Amino acid sequence: ITQVGLNFSRPAAQILGQYYQFIRLGFQGYKEVQQNSMAVADYLHAEIGKMAPFQNYSKDVVNPLFIWYLKPDYAKSAKWTLYDLQDKLKQSGWMVPAYTLPENLENWVVMRIVVRQGFSRDMADQLLGDISNAITDLEKLEYPTPTRIAQDRQQAVKGSVFTHTGCPKSTK
């Protein structure tokens, strides 16, 4: 063979990148990367679970991701929702989505964290600090937020839509 070429679409590029990482790091190196992601996810899960407003959805973390929600008793008296927390965190540069669960659980609003490769313990501490600061700011509110009012009226509430351009997505 005198020439080798790869023809792949964009999704295949990510798979090829994954293969490269596996070959470069080897099994042990790749395992360490995943163990680090799990350790950071476990840490975040535990620390967020200790925060007064929140309840983790699951007891254990089995993948480097988890979700949490407002404790029902806290949510009854709060003047804000997780959508408001999402917006506050976005102001600090964090993309932590808030959304409703699928059918039959659509009344549950949750937030999700996915710990990716390279997300360090220092970054986790910074995120926790920003969550804590956002909660402090939200708890100082004198009046309920528009999302809280809509939620109380049982109106549909959706979080803001993220785009890399900063412009709303076109509906053309």
Pin down the residues of each PLM region.
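Catalytic-loop motifs flanking and including active-site residues across diverse enzymes
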Residues: 10-17, 62
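Short glycine/serine- and small hydrophobic-enriched flexible loop segments
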Residues: 20-24
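A short glycine-threonine-serine/GTX helix/turn-capping micro-motif
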Residues: 1-10
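Non-catalytic terminal extensions of PLP-dependent enzymes
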Residues: 26-172
